[in-house]
Amino acid sequence: MTQFIKGQWVAGLGHAVTSKNPANNDVIWNSQTATPEQVNTAVEAAREVQFDWFMLGFEARLAIVEAYRAQLEENKAEIAETIAQETGKPQWETATEAGAMIGKIGLSVAAYNKRTGTSENDTPAGRAVLRHKPHGVVAVFGPYNFPGHLPNGHIVPALLAGNTVVFKPSELTPKVAELMLKLWEKAGLPAGVINLVQGEVETGKALASHPQIDGLFFTGSSRTGHILHQQYAGEPGKILALEMGGNNPLIIKGVKDSKAAVHDIIQSAYISSGQRCTCARRLYVEKGAEGDALLAQLTDAVKRIVVGAWNAQPQPFMGAMISETAAKGMVEAQRNLVNLGGHSLVELTHIEEGTGLVSPGLIDVSQVIELPDEEYFGPLLQVVRYTDFDEAIKLANNTRYGLSAGILADSRDDYEYFLARIRAGIVNWNKQITGASGAAPFGGVGASGNHRASAFYAADYCAYPVASVEADEVSLPANLSPGLSL
């Protein structure tokens, strides 16, 4: 019983699907997918209760969301372990994700009150009131890299605003989604307010194309996001929020503390085995002795990064990638870059057949004439040597994406020069570019999204504004308009 529809756990009626631990191939979850007919039932269930959920009022909805926060707190160890087993991420990292899920509740409440609450102003024409109303039934498509935190960042603000939800998680992390729904159930969420449909492409297509959904919130690949964007092109009445990936640049310029720089580069490129949408993919290092020394130090540090299973002791920095297929894809990406003229400084290797375990890679692509503008979603960092700062910024901007970017530089003037010219939604200075604040918006430009920033701005796409001019009774104006007599 792995589908949660109309408050009931039911079996999927589609084909069999299995989730395995990518570090050792242990079966984590095994069931059947939801059929298009079951997706339809889920959407109908969400539609049936949506108005009642909205009319319950914000305070009553908030009480249930707060009860969910209590469930997250009580079960954070189980959440962290489930994420670790299903994604292969090390336990220290999944504990951080479980904590972020808890923190998201307070941030979402603050965002709702600040960006989509109710306000009144007296005007000569009457009382001007701004309110916000939910879109209705929204679909949430979750990713595998943060299977708890990222869908949580759509679901919580959607519910606070009064929407009901049909949640389709990644087929690679179904157990995490199942655990989330069990916690919502324990929190006392009314039947039908969230419905869970587990499945692969067929399930996703049935949900995305359903005529009765009012919006879709997606986190995932640029390829899938573009398909959804094309699909919704003729439906302006539906809200579509896309958070996609990036070919993210990091520039190094004039840093005295090379050890700190190496640390921030590693945290930018290799955390989560490179499976964060904000991970650095391209590193720009100045030519010359200083750049040579930094690169040598980085090369040595990358070689010493510890890779291991999710539960290894002492804990590794990098766990497994999400699957063996993903791991082999990174080996192939490295091979392609070498064939184009790249030189491996640290070779990325597939550590163990049948698993997602890979070692981190570092490759100098300075001699590659036509560098592919691709998001290689794994622990492979491309190095480009430069001589001129403007040249480095131009190269950094030479991408169809625009999610995150950063510069490590001791000079604030260099940072401000970079900030004014770089094209990205997240721009960090002397910090890893995978670092983002939940109290700020999260999103990019270009192929990285469709101008629907999430995190603190998720409240914006979960409700629409309703502007009213009001008076307590009908009354004549002091002066009638010219040409009128009553």
Swiss-Prot record:
Keyword NAD: yes
InterPro entries from the UniProt entry: Ald_DH/histidinol_DH (IPR016161), Ald_DH_C (IPR016163), Ald_DH_CS_CYS (IPR016160), Ald_DH_CS_GLU (IPR029510), Ald_DH_N (IPR016162), Aldehyde_DH_dom (IPR015590), SuccinylGlu_semiald_DH_AstD (IPR017649)
Residues the record marks as active site: E243, C277
Pfam families, A to Z: Aldedh (PF00171)
Keywords: Arginine metabolism, NAD, Oxidoreductase
Entry keyword 4Fe-4S: no
Pathway: Amino-acid degradation; L-arginine degradation via AST pathway; L-glutamate and succinate from L-arginine: step 4/5
Residues reported to bind NAD(+): G220, S221, S222, R223, T224, G225
Record-listed E.C. numbers: 1.2.1.71
GO MF terms, alphabetically ordered: succinylglutamate-semialdehyde dehydrogenase activity
CDD domains per the UniProt record, alphabetical: ALDH_SGSD_AstD
Catalytic activity field: N-succinyl-L-glutamate 5-semialdehyde + NAD(+) + H2O = N-succinyl-L-glutamate + NADH + 2 H(+)
Biological process annotations from GO: arginine catabolic process to glutamate; arginine catabolic process to succinate
Family listed: Belongs to the aldehyde dehydrogenase family. AstD subfamily.
Task performed by this protein: Catalyzes the NAD-dependent reduction of succinylglutamate semialdehyde into succinylglutamate.
UniProt protein name: N-succinylglutamate 5-semialdehyde dehydrogenase
Species of the source: Shewanella sediminis (strain HAW-EB3)
